[in-house]
Structures are given as C-alpha cells and as structure tokens.
C-alpha cells in the first residue's frame, strides 16, 4: 500500500499512479498465499495453495501437487495458467524474470514463447532487467498481439537500489501511526524477520546492501527500513516509467493494456 494511488503520503509511484488515474484500481485484491512462491503459484494458476500444493518456500511445501494418474500428455494446470491464456488467445508471450530459477519453480515459465533471465536469482537490481525489456519492445515494435511480463525485485529485501539513486525521502516524514509505543513492541519481539532479525535469522549487515539494516532498535533504524523500501518502490516506478515512455514513443501506449501487480507487499510494522 506504499503507492500514491492507494493513499500513501510519500510520492513513491508517480508513473504507476498515472496509469491508475487513467485505468482501474482494485481495492479488494489480496495475496492468497505468502511469501513469493505460494503467492505466484496461486496467481498464475488461479488455484489456492491448499489445492495446488505450494504453500511455503521449502520442503514439500514448496512443490506443486502432482496431478497423479489423471495427468494427460500436457499438464492441464500449466496449460490453463495465466500466461497461457494470452498465448491460447493468439498472443506472442515473453517474460523478463529470474523468479523461476530463484525458487526452482519452472512451472512459472509455462505459456511464454520467450524467457529472459539475467541470472541474478532475484538478487539483481532493476537496471539489469530494464535493458532486456526495452530491447524486446524495440525488436517487436511492429508485432501485434503480444504479452510482455517484466519483473522488478527492487522493493524486495534486501533493499538494493543503487547508491547513485540517493534517498529522495531523506527529509520526508514517516507515517505518524508508528509511535514510540508500537516501535517498542516490535523491538522486544523475537523471531524471523522481526525488528531484531530483519534478515530472517540474524541482524548482520551486508556491505553489498548498504540500504538494508540488520535490525531496528530505534527510530533511526525504523527510518532506514522504510526509506529503503520506499526507495525500492520509487526506483521500480522510475524504471517502469521508462517502459511507458518507450511505448509512447512507439505510438502504442494507448493501445496497450497495462497490468501492475505484485506477489506480496512488505510488513513494515502494521
């Protein structure tokens, strides 16, 4: 919900907000299973995790349920997934994403004619992804009926926006609902991904990700986390804006249906 079109006070999504103003906003659109893998399994299959089998990130909980003896020559879940709907409708489909490799969830690529993987396993930043998307659009500018899926990880932990982007929110106040009482409750709560162990199981900081703190022990740490997330959202929005600019340059922006979605958000103390 850290988007202007959903009422967030910080200017994190000017480009996506414009799409929202010109299009449709979904107010009752909920992640049916978290984190990433089960959420996307449900998103692309249209089947809740309790039925498709993917309900976690490890062990058998991370595997989709086998169809069993009734499986036909081609898996029917994959054949009827979100991406294949476009392909069966006659569209040429392509994806720029590392998701399938990150989670060994190769079913995610079902339905795409082309798949591009920068090889970062989800640890890459958007400036590695954007050139592939722009190149694809330039090479296919004369093609009709296409579906291009572009995946940016930048709002995801660890926060990895390039330092050269700066911090546009350095002097912008945080939401006031996170008062000292709420912050203290989080500081004294233990467990994976809590304020004490943001990395999941430890509070160590990685020099590779200077925006990403290992813990939140005071309001300075709180600001680092929220600024890190918001910078990731704004950076992704900036990259998405460059895609929109190219579509306008090619004269197809008004004829293109744009879908902006995510597999989950971030729990920032709510």
Q: What do these predicted regions represent?
A:
Residues 1-270:
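Catalytic domains that recognize anionic headgroups
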């Amino acid at each position: 919900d850290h988007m202007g079109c959903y009422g967030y006070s910080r200017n994190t999504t000017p480009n996506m907000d414009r799409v929202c103003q010109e299009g449709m906003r979904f107010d009752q659109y909920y992640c049916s299973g978290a984190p990433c893998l089960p959420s996307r399994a449900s998103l692309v299959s249209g089947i809740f995790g309790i039925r498709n089998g993917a309900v976690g990130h490890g062990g058998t909980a991370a595997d989709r349920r086998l169809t069993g003896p009734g499986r036909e020559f081609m898996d029917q879940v994959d054949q009827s997934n979100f991406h294949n709907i476009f392909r069966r409708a006659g569209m040429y489909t392509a994806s720029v994403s590392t998701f399938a490799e990150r989670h060994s969830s190769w079913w995610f690529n079902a339905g795409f004619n082309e798949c591009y993987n920068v090889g970062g396993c989800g640890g890459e930043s958007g400036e590695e992804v954007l050139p592939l998307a722009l190149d694809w659009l330039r090479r296919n500018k004369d093609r009709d009926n296409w579906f291009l899926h572009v995946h940016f990880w930048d709002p995801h932990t660890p926060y990895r926006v390039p330092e050269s982007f700066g911090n546009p929110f350095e002097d912008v106040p945080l939401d006031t609902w996170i008062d000292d009482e709420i912050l203290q409750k989080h500081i004294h709560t233990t467990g994976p991904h809590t304020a004490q162990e943001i990395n999941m199981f430890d509070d160590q900081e990685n020099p590779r990700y200077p925006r990403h703190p290992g813990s939140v022990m005071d309001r300075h740490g709180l600001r680092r986390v929220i600024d890190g997330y918001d910078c990731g959202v704004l950076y992704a929005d900036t990259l998405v804006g460059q895609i929109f600019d190219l579509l306008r340059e090619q004269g197809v922006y008004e004829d293109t249906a744009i879908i902006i979605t995510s597999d989950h958000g971030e729990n920032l103390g709510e």
